[in-house]
Amino acid sequence: MNQRIRRARNIDKVMTVIFYAIAVFFFVLLAAFAGKVIIGGFAGATPEMFAFARKGSIGNQLFNTIYLVFISLVVSAPIGIFAGIYLAMYAKQGFMTKFLRICIETLSSLPSIVVGRFGYLVFLVMMGLGKSLLAGALSVSILTLPLITTTTEDAIKGLPAGYTQASLGLGATKWQTIFHVLLPACVPRIMTGIILAAGRGFGEAAVLLYTTGSGSSLRWGNWDLSSPTCPLNIFRPAETLSIQIWNLQTNGQDRALANLASAVLMLLVLAFSIGANVWSRRLAKKTAGDEK
């Protein structure tokens, strides 16, 4: 008996060491990759590369990237959250619900180049939007919508049944229970889905090749929303950081600028993820009554 216990403890120690070694390996691998991209990107950078110029800089592309992801989340986040609520709270088990879930899973696994082609045919050819920020954002929202939907559904279903039962028992309606009890409790997990969706939007290139174009000529003193050089005009062509990296690498142009754009894009995703996580945790504490 003692020998079996000793053997089990030895196996436990060995497995613990193995798991720690795997964790350290992946941490070192991630740190090395991020360090290589960031250090290599800023090593050859010059102050002019950070300007908001038409060529030879990343300022306009950085703004276009943030603006496009913001527009895509404005479209996909509300629709995805409401779709997740419907699937978790209202959808009845049956053929249509199963078919809807299969469609969502299929949509989430579609190659981005296929979605880009679809966006080109629908938003550019059929709707006549032309290559623009709006067409790109709508196409990216197609990719991010399934992720937000499934995250919201899983978050609501993962809550204890007592949340719903207690709220309904106190006289709240189903709608009040969802918005005042369930959703606040799901904020961290829903934000995780939105963060992942935003991360995919930041890095998309194949979709945007068909839909946004490569224009980055902006006039920062021009706030006429109908002007093609107005930064806030959603109907203008817009080159994002990922498209800029692709153009520079494939055309063999300024490699230092491409490296800088890669480093800035990685830092942008990292900063957004950290900021959104901190904000969602603070919001979760406030809704739970831990903070005043």
Stretches with model-predicted labels:
Residues 105-143:
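Generic hydrophobic transmembrane alpha-helix motif, especially the helices
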Residues 111, 170-171, 184:
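Glycine/proline-centered hinge or cleavage motifs at structural transition points of membrane proteins
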Residues 174-212:
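Transmembrane alpha-helices
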Residues 49-56, 208-266:
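Interhelical loop and adjacent transmembrane-helix boundary motif
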Residues 2-18, 36-74, 244-255:
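Periplasmic/extracellular loop-to-transmembrane helix junction in inner-membrane transport proteins
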Residues 91, 157, 195, 231, ...:
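C-terminal transmembrane helix and the adjacent membrane-cytosol boundary/short C-terminal tail
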Residues 1-22, 278-292:
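Transmembrane alpha-helical segments of polytopic membrane transport and secretion proteins
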Residues 72-104, 117, 276-285:
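Transmembrane-helix boundary motif in ABC transporter permease subunits
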